[in-house]
Every structure is written in C-alpha cells, then in structure tokens.
Amino acid sequence: MARIAGVNIPNHQHTVIGLTAIFGIGTTRANKICQTTGVAIDKKVKDLTDADLEKLRDEVGKFITEGDLRREVTMSIKRLMDLGCYRGVRHRKGLPVRGQRTKTNARTRKGPRKSGVQLKK
C-alpha cells in the first residue's frame, strides 16, 4: 500500500481512484494531479515506481487535505454559529442550511421522527 498525505491507498486500485481516498481530493483534482505529474491514469497503485509516488506526494502536498481541511471546515461552521447568522442558527438547530423544505422530508438532518402528541386518558 502506498502512503500519500497520511492515507494508505489500496494497491489494487487505479491511481485516479486511489487518490480520491484522500479527503479533499475528488476525481477532477485526482485527474489534474496525474496529468501534471505525468503518471498514467489507468496505472495501478502497486505498479507505481518510487519516483512516481514521490511526484504524487509533492503534488498532493500543494493542496489543503485531510486533517487541515477538516479543521478548516469545522472552524468555518463554528464561525457561522458564533456570528448568529441564519446559516449558523440552522447549523446549531440541526436543520437544513441551504433552504430545503422541512415540513416534509429533511429526515437525515432532523433525525428519526419523534412520537406524536399523546392524548390524555
């Protein structure tokens, strides 16, 4: 297994697919990285030479990935919540942030249904 940006990339995968295992690198960025380093897209990770891996590590190192990116996203959400703006309030309440309807749907964000109002006996 090759180790790039602190992530073990499976040997049996193609280089492009393997790079997407790194948080912050999707298919478009993985294609761009392979293109700039000159590594074949359809080459398996186990077939990469040490020189190829070093090129990939250097290119991936230019981007914000993994822990730094996760921290940045978390801090961005925390900043919104501290500001008390609409988006921050929605994050705090655990509701959809981007204007989706909540009368029906939004179950992923709201969690499982609470039991309904019970009648007095």
UniProtKB/Swiss-Prot annotation:
Molecular function as annotated in GO: rRNA binding; structural constituent of ribosome; tRNA binding
Transmembrane spans: none
Keywords for this protein: Ribonucleoprotein, Ribosomal protein, RNA-binding, rRNA-binding, tRNA-binding
Pfam families hit by this protein: Ribosomal_S13
Listed InterPro entries: Rbsml_uS13_C, Ribosomal_uS13, Ribosomal_uS13-like_H2TH, Ribosomal_uS13_bac-type, Ribosomal_uS13_CS
GO-annotated cellular components: cytosol; small ribosomal subunit
Region feature Disordered, mapped onto this chain: 92-121
GO biological process, alphabetically ordered: translation
Subunit and partners: Part of the 30S ribosomal subunit. Forms a loose heterodimer with protein S19. Forms two bridges to the 50S subunit in the 70S ribosome.
PANTHER family linked to this entry: 30S RIBOSOMAL PROTEIN S13/40S RIBOSOMAL PROTEIN S18, SMALL RIBOSOMAL SUBUNIT PROTEIN US13M
UniProt family annotation: Belongs to the universal ribosomal protein uS13 family.
Function (record text): Located at the top of the head of the 30S subunit, it contacts several helices of the 16S rRNA. In the 70S ribosome it contacts the 23S rRNA (bridge B1a) and protein L5 of the 50S subunit (bridge B1b), connecting the 2 subunits; these bridges are implicated in subunit movement. Contacts the tRNAs in the A and P-sites.
Protein name: Small ribosomal subunit protein uS13
